Curated annotation (Swiss-Prot):
EC number: 4.1.1.11
Manner of cofactor binding, per the entry note: Binds 1 pyruvoyl group covalently per subunit.
GO cellular component terms, A-Z: cytosol
Gene designation: panD
Role of this protein: Catalyzes the pyruvoyl-dependent decarboxylation of aspartate to produce beta-alanine.
Primary location recorded for the protein, binned into one broad class: cytoplasm
Cofactor(s) demanded: pyruvate
Reaction equation(s) it catalyzes: L-aspartate + H(+) = beta-alanine + CO2
Organism: Bordetella pertussis (strain Tohama I / ATCC BAA-589 / NCTC 13251)
The name this protein goes by in its record: Aspartate 1-decarboxylase
UniProt KW keywords: Autocatalytic cleavage, Cytoplasm, Decarboxylase, Lyase, Pantothenate biosynthesis, Pyruvate, Schiff base, Zymogen
Gene3D superfamilies the UniProt entry points to: 2.40.40.20
The protein's annotated pathway: Cofactor biosynthesis; (R)-pantothenate biosynthesis; beta-alanine from L-aspartate: step 1/1
Amino acid sequence: MQRIMLRAKLHRVTVTEADLHYEGSCGIDEDLLDAAGMREFERIELYNVTNGERFDTYIIKAARGSGAISLNGAAARRAQVGDLLIICTYGPMSEEQSAAHKPQVVLVDDANRVKEIRKFPA
């Protein structure tokens, strides 16, 4: 049996841009992608801490070191610049893999720079 498990999480990043007329997706600073082990075009689930919205889209790379978190297309209706988000990826794992799995959690500062990387639970 396979279980769908939390693989990685960007915790409380701040939306820096919302562009309704761009072709879908979520732009994420490459430094954050590397820290979380996330990849371009990977499906993500987003949880808006500010307004309670929950939605999904896919990743595109934003400039390294920019702190960018941009919501594009329809996703731009789900959050505003300044909103706090939790961005998660999930993946299938066997019973054995899931028993030992510890998701990667990336904590950021107010400028969306990596502050700490944790394996959860600590």
